Amino acid sequence: MITVSPAEPRDAAAIAALLEDLGRFYDATESEPLDRRIGQINEAIFTSPPAAYALLARDGDQVAGLAAYSFLWPAAGATRSLYLKELYVPDAYRRQGVGKLLMHAIFETAATLGCSRVEWTTDTGNIAAQAFYAELGVPTHRSKVFYRVEDTGSGLGSIVRGQT
């Protein structure tokens, strides 16, 4: 039986493994050493206050999926929204309802905490993810344009200084 619960500090290595698998899914070519990734996970999720949160789907002792999220403010009025950064289910658990369980847990978390909405993105080429969200009955919003600035080694500050 698959269960969903908040991640705990003892889960950091399992989260690191899922994120490594996620990176391979997106054809990432670089990976940081495991101890550094675990340190980043602990710093992001298990400090007070946390910068991010994670829900894990479990099949007994096996981790069957991850939903990583943060809160954004302001949303509608002075409310906040829950931003789902990653929903990831390894191949072995796909098409078994794990993603739906994680999404329902995300929606329940948002409702319990008084969020006015849940938001997320998916890659334009990830047709399977788009079909999954459509099956959930979630409409696509095309009213926003997404921007991203990445640190390419010269530091994000170079953009602020006009050195792009």
Give short role names for the model-derived ranges:
Residues A44-L55, Y83:
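A short helix-loop-beta-strand connector motif used in the catalytic cores of GNAT acetyltransferases and
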Residues A16-E43:
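Conserved GNAT-fold acetyl-CoA-binding loop/helix
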Residues E119-A129, R148-D151:
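Conserved beta-strand-loop-alpha-helix junction that forms the acyl-donor binding cleft
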Residues A111-T121:
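Conserved GNAT acetyl-CoA-binding A-motif
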Residues T3-A17:
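A short beta-loop-alpha structural element at the N-terminal edge
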Residues W73-L84, R94, H141-R142:
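A conserved beta-turn-beta hairpin within the catalytic core of GNAT-like acetyltransferases
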Residues L56, Q62-F71, Y88:
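Conserved beta-strand in the GNAT
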Residues V89, R95-E108, A131, E135:
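Conserved acetyl-CoA-binding loop-helix of GNAT-fold acetyltransferases
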